[in-house]
A protein has these predicted regions:
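NAD(P)-dependent short-chain dehydrogenase/reductase
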Residues: 145-197, 202, 232, 239
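N-terminal Rossmann NAD(P)H-binding glycine-rich loop of SDR-like oxidoreductase domains
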Residues: 7-27
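Glycine-rich Rossmann NAD(P)(H)-binding loop
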Residues: 162-166, 189-199, 221-230, 252-256, ...
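Amphipathic terminal alpha-helices
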Residues: 277-301
Length: 301
């Protein structure tokens, strides 16, 4: 199926991921319909402002692929109320699955945070026993719920911490925070230096979704999606080597999150190679800082 025969429904089109993904797929000549609530700003003039839960079955069934980005998308956003984040992340997700037919493909975003506090390199078979936060629980629920619909084409992506430029930037993400601090103040402050993080470059994420769109064989499956793994201190030291400046370790804000993910399954199933590095992500941010339209911190909802 050629691009012009595919119709993409992009839910959460104007957020951090959506802003970049829309531009990427538009450049590839995909037919895209955007839907977003503009919680963090309006990035695209053609976006429909609506809660995706209000979309009808008839409307949703017009599309060959649905990409679900709309969510309470961070631990912080979910911190005040399990009810609100559960309604958005889980209840709306279930109703969306019920609306799609077996010929459509749904791509949704899960998170590597579901692995919690684990320094070992883990793949998708690693047992998930429980989350460290409301956010984690909603993502674990989504992954379990998706598996209950084996006849539907549902692809879940357990994303590493995303790094890279977007017009709707997220400055609190690890590489984004380190890069902007290094560029603007010549100083980086980190906590939990020995904890691991899986980092996903924005360009790799866009490429991975493109690979799914182009695939003729879709498995109902969850994939780890990450470009590289390292300790937080190692990411900071690499950026210091690139751009110089002072590196300060502050251990006054400990966290239990430490995750280290193997993305081999996705690479095998989609004949894909992750290319992003700390260097490519840093360059992507540094050369596009002046293009940032919104840089709002993701706060509780």
């Amino acid at each position: 199926m050629k691009n012009q025969n595919k119709k993409i429904l992009l839910l959460g089109s104007d957020g951090y991921i959506g802003s970049s993904l829309y531009d990427y797929l538009t450049n590839l000549k995909y037919d895209i319909c955007n839907v977003d609530l503009f919680w963090f700003g309006k990035m695209h003039q053609n976006t429909i402002q609506k809660n995706y839960d209000e979309l009808t079955v008839e409307f949703i069934n017009k599309f060959s692929h649905i990409i679900l980005l709309a969510a309470h998308s961070s631990v912080a956003m979910c911190s005040n109320s399990l009810e609100s984040c559960f309604n958005n992340n889980v209840s709306n997700f279930i109703r969306l699955i019920e609306k799609i037919n077996n010929n459509q493909t749904l791509i949704y975003m899960s998170s590597a945070a579901v692995y919690g506090n684990n320094d070992k390199l883990v793949d998708e078979t690693y047992p998930i026993t429980g989350g460290l936060s409301f956010y984690d629980y909603t993502k674990i629920c989504n992954d379990n719920i998706a598996s209950l619909y084996p006849n539907k084409k549902i692809v879940g992506l357990r994303l590493g911490t995303i790094g890279g430029f977007s017009k709707n930037f997220r400055c609190e993400n690890l590489i984004n925070s380190l890069a902007t601090a290094s560029i603007k103040s010549n100083k980086m402050i980190i906590t939990n230096p020995e904890n691991y993080r899986s980092v996903l470059g924005m360009k790799d994420l866009c490429r991975s979704i493109h690979a799914i769109l182009e695939s003729d064989t879709i498995k109902n499956r969850i994939y780890n999606i990450t470009s590289l793994n390292a300790k937080i201190i190692e990411f900071a030291e690499k950026i210091k080597n690139i751009n110089g400046g002072e590196l300060i370790v502050n251990d006054s804000l400990p966290t239990n999150y430490s995750f280290n993910c193997d993305s081999s399954l996705f690479q095998t199933d989609y004949n894909f190679k992750f290319n992003d590095t700390v260097e490519t992500i840093f360059v992507d941010i540094s050369k596009n800082l002046h293009m940032i339209v919104s840089n709002l911190k993701r706060t509780p909802r």
